[in-house]
Amino acid sequence: MIQPQSYLTAADNSGARKLMCIRVLGGGNRRYARIGDVIVAVVKDGIPNIPIKKSDTVKAVIVRTRKELKRDNGMNICFDDNAAVIINADGNPRGTRVFGPVARELRDKNFTKIISLAPEVL
């Protein structure tokens, strides 16, 4: 569960390393975001000489959370870190690679481009 002021790692090669959530999108006053939700984040740490710089405001989709996710078949899935992929206004990732596993629930939310770039889908 991601809420404002939560730190995440960037799971792509867009140039950001650390992100901080500042808003959960979707609904008036949503408190938490889960896998597949879109957030507004600020870049706290980045790679030099890349278009995405520190203190830039970006939209990102959450691909991994430490909080377990209950599936309909009764299985619980959780990851070692909280991670997000930076997206543009169309919902496509700004980077060209995605690092680490991502959850299958992204396919239900129409983030198929992220699914195709990921090395492993759980």
From Swiss-Prot:
Encoding gene (name): rpl14
Pfam family name, one: Ribosomal_L14
Single annotated GO MF: large ribosomal subunit rRNA binding
Subcellular localization: Plastid, Cyanelle
Entry annotated with the keyword Plastid: yes
Subunit text: Part of the 50S ribosomal subunit.
Protein name: Large ribosomal subunit protein uL14c
InterPro entries in alphabetical order: Ribosomal_uL14, Ribosomal_uL14_bac-type, Ribosomal_uL14_CS, Ribosomal_uL14_sf
One GO cellular component term: cytosolic large ribosomal subunit
Described function: Binds to 23S rRNA.
Keyword RNA-binding: yes
Keywords, sorted A to Z: Cyanelle, Plastid, Ribonucleoprotein, Ribosomal protein, RNA-binding, rRNA-binding
Family: Belongs to the universal ribosomal protein uL14 family.
Highest taxon listed in the record's lineage: Eukaryota
Lineage, top ranks: Eukaryota, Glaucocystophyceae, Cyanophoraceae, Cyanophora
GO biological process, one term: translation
SMART domains: Ribosomal_L14
Main location: plastid
